From Swiss-Prot:
It comes from Aedes densonucleosis virus (strain GKV 002 002) (Aedes densovirus). Residues 192-466 form the PV NS1-Nuc domain. Disulfide bonds: none annotated. A motif (RCR-2) lies at residues 374-376. Its main location: host cell. A divalent metal cation binds at D370, H374, H376. SUPFAM superfamilies: P-loop containing nucleoside triphosphate hydrolases (SSF52540). This is Initiator protein NS1. InterPro entries: Helicase_SF3_DNA-vir, P-loop_NTPase, Parvovirus_NS1_helicase, PV_NS1-NUC. Residues 594-749 form the SF3 helicase domain.
Amino acid sequence: MEYGLISKFYMDHWRWKIREKHKVENNLLSTYKYILNFHYHMVHPYIRSTKGGPNRVMNSVCVEHSPCEHGNLFCECIYCWEHDGQCRGRKLDLGASTGIERRLANDNQQPGLSDLYCTETIHLATAIPERRTIDRENYVKDFAGQTVGDLYPQLQGSTGASEPIDFAFPTVGSGSWEILVRESHKHFEPNYTEEAYQSHIRSVRRRLFPEETMDNNGSQASTTEMLRDAVQRCGFEGPPNSPSENNRDGIDGTCISTVDIQSNCIVNAHCPKQGTSNQTNKRKKSTDTTESSGSKKNKSSNYQQNLQEQGSTSISDTIDIVDGELDGSTGSNRETAYYTFVLHKNNVKEDWRYIATTRAKQAPSFITFDHGDHIHILFSSSNTGGNSTRVRTRITKFLSATSAGSAEATITFSKVKFLRNYILYCIRYGIETVNIYGNKIQQQLTEAMDTFKILFENRDPNDVILEAGCKLYHEEKKDNKQKRCGQRKQQNLTDIILEKIKEKKITTAQQWENQIEPEFKIQLMKEFGLNVDSYVTRIVRIERTRIQQLIKAKTLTEIMLEILNDEYIKHFTPGEDNSKTAKCIEWIEYLFKENNINIIHFLAWNEIIKTKRYKKINGMVLEGITNAGKSLILDNLLAMVKPEEIPRERDNSGFHLDQVPGAGSILFEEPMITPVNVGTWKLLLEGKTIKTDVKNKDKEPIERTPTWITTATPITNNIDMNETSQILQRIKLYILKKSIQHRDDKYTINAQIQNKLISRPPTLIEPIHMAIVFIKNFTKIYNLIAEEDKAHTVNEKAIQINNEVKEEAESWQTALQWTMTENNEEQNENETQALEDQVLELAKEQATT
């Protein structure tokens, strides 16, 4: 078939199809295909004659942009690429008829209308009808009984049949039929090249079968199906999926395949030899169970194969364990999208390749376009963008980006809606190399490389601007870009600060100043100015409040389990000496025993206070002499509870409780209860709602907040007996009578003091030690709480522990008891062996003497 005029055989074929359309067609699938083909070729004819020469007058491609400089509607040169596919205002009617002479009709008579785009002449009637549109009345008359449902009822009656396209056939010879035939040129568009012809076919296909495509402002998934339909995939040499010696492709810092650009040609890709590494692939075992037999066979092959061969083979629908992306058939492209960001090379460590060899994790999958002093990074992730931030962070860590580089990546991060436009943008500003990295090549990245190969080989060398400065890549129009930049700028700054706050676990503005690198803060000031500090202060406050609200809703058991899950593996290593940790736990139990305090009773009441379990009891007091271990116990027990600390010096201030509103818990150090403030203290320790003064604000209410107090003297020293009894009813009091020994000094420590001293702990006491003690006695603690419930009024609003937490605590309890027993047996064996060795040495000394 010619690309210009429709041949006689072609039209005879479809006339026969029309005559046969009323016959019985038993095969449902063939019937449906026939309807699609008829609609595709007859209702929407889209092949227009190319005669007339290059000087023909052509209207604009769309209502907003000027026509192509080459007279081509779908030009793909450097100058015209940004208009193709971006405008929804395209015109289907490209102008009036040109009046070009056509060949005669089949009956060799001069046609009545010479500008009809078909080989059959529709002779003019005695009077040319004035109406050129089909109104409702004519539609009912001319299309009666001609719909798909009327002609092919089996399409709707068959089980599982898909819904046919909604169109109807006009009655042959009717007025509507004549109008459609005479105005069929409205559906024609000029085509001058093979690529333009294929592009137009795809546009008609998209109108017939709408897909998730891209628009100017939408956030739908990008796809390369249009290019893949037009030309075959162009492969290049190199095995992007072939395994290295230790099955850790891409982890050693070398790219899987590289495309070097030299002059105006493209050199075949090469795969650098993978270096060996002593690190084992921790994720290998987990991914083996999810891989299909096809992917295993593909990975185990040792021969070299190019991407074209790989594209012809089936790719298993598996999940990339590292990035959580679907790596499978073409249908998965609708669920993924492309993302990009920029990294300058001075924001990446020079030895990043060596650093990559020390990592045991799999390398992320991405493509880099080298622009000299900076690189553009392209990767695929979920279309919703929920996983894109995590993948971007993994890529920056793999490239060993500095703090300034991480900020730059976050600032320049954006979604790629038009893959072809993005690659043309990279080509326009010059490319030195194109690299693919990753332990596993995703299908989306393979399609991106195929698209790059096609566009690079068909580029115009005069359009490449090698010395031009690379501009930021934006796909919006200028007006949309200006509207977006203000909001996006604030959003980027907020995301950068919030990500850093979560990474460093910052809760105050001063921690931001102390822990954040100066280079990172300077980079933010370059991009956003001096208002960064106000953003930091506000975001830190919001994040601190969020954390407090989460902790406030948890039981002490849940918090202890979180500590174990995060810290246990650091302190108990299988096969190593864990005696120091075991000795610390024994020392904590020894501390409570020396002070005549039941440790189970103490831990149970801490859980009661934290969960607000009983009415009118909202405080716990630790009273004892200096250096008795009061702060040591509470600091480690409440480390993750994060109580608001209030020192004694604020008692004389009218705003000494302004920190309490919104706090999850409170820790008072050496407070002074006087006849003046005893009423406030009773309400606070009872759990009633009170109001307090806040500077430059109205009074703020204080809801029931768990309260802990440490004091060296009784807190009721300054009030009378009646008030004392009321205070003691609202608290749980524990008295520490012995002090912890600081040093051995025979001049300062006498016999009387020596009897009141407790030996120093074997090493630094940490929250993990208190968590082990708590969970190890979990069952006993909750049994005691059940007994205490009988003697107290239970608060109906108390925080309850759920069954999942109980099951996890019980499993941890069993594991800890077994571990501690094993460590004790090992320790006893070591001590016995040491004693035996000592006896043998003494015996040898006596024998020699």
